[in-house]
Regions:
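Amphipathic alpha-helical packing segments from all-alpha helical-bundle domains
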Residues: 70-74, 121-147, 157-161, 165, ...
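Amphipathic C-terminal alpha-helical segment
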Residues: 99-103, 134, 139, 143, ...
Length: 203
């Protein structure tokens, strides 16, 4: 049953301000030690205002991740629909993934580190949202097998896991690095290695 105290309209500026503040606080302090009061202070609202929008800290984390991911998926689907080549679709998806998190280090920290410390939140996110991402990858791989761009015997599930895993590790390495380099620049070489392996190009 919906909480009658939580506003139906979550598109307000104050709602987004609380989400942005939460991402910053979670990234700086860590999810488990962060308090609602920390988020309220960062958002410049009263503690009670946060509770008008969210029941607890877990719901704030889920809402922040889901809102960001939904926006990413809308852009990804829109851009990939313009590309007929499976290879180009994978390249573009890798670029968009790295670009999105590379542009927001706080969100990258929350997604790579804090979300994964909450088993429940990670399971819910994977079940509800990550499957959409993998569907885009597996569709590109399937189309590539059909068109002859990719090996027909290649297992799609394993290939999709390798694709996501490689990008995911690039983001984690960037988050942990003290160097602030353009993360999206890794997209092309990463996809080249995935598609072509380490063998020299044939002449």
């Amino acid at each position: 049953m919906p909480n009658p105290l939580i506003p139906a309209n979550r598109s307000s500026e104050k709602y987004q301000r609380i989400l942005d503040a939460a991402v910053a606080v979670f990234a700086e302090k860590g999810f488990f030690v962060s308090r609602i009061s920390d988020i309220a202070d960062r958002a410049d609202v009263a503690d009670g205002t946060v509770y008008l929008y969210f029941k607890n800290k877990d719901e704030i984390l889920a809402s922040a991740i889901n809102t960001a991911f939904d926006g990413f998926m809308i852009r990804a689907r829109t851009e990939l629909e313009k590309l007929s080549s499976p290879t180009q679709r994978l390249r573009r998806l890798a670029y968009l993934h790295l670009e999105a998190l590379g542009a927001n280090r706080n969100m990258a920290v929350v997604f790579q580190m804090e979300l994964r410390q909450s088993t429940r939140s990670l399971a819910e996110f994977s079940h509800q949202h990550l499957v959409e991402y993998f569907n885009l990858v597996r569709q590109a791989i399937s189309d590539g097998k059909t068109s002859g761009e990719f090996r027909p015997e290649m297992p799609e599930k394993i290939a999709a896991n390798c694709f996501f895993g490689a990008i995911d590790e690039m983001v984690t390495s960037w988050v942990l690095s003290e160097k602030d380099y353009p993360l999206a620049h890794a997209a092309d070489p990463l996809v080249d290695i995935l598609l072509n392996g380490m063998r020299p190009a044939t002449r």
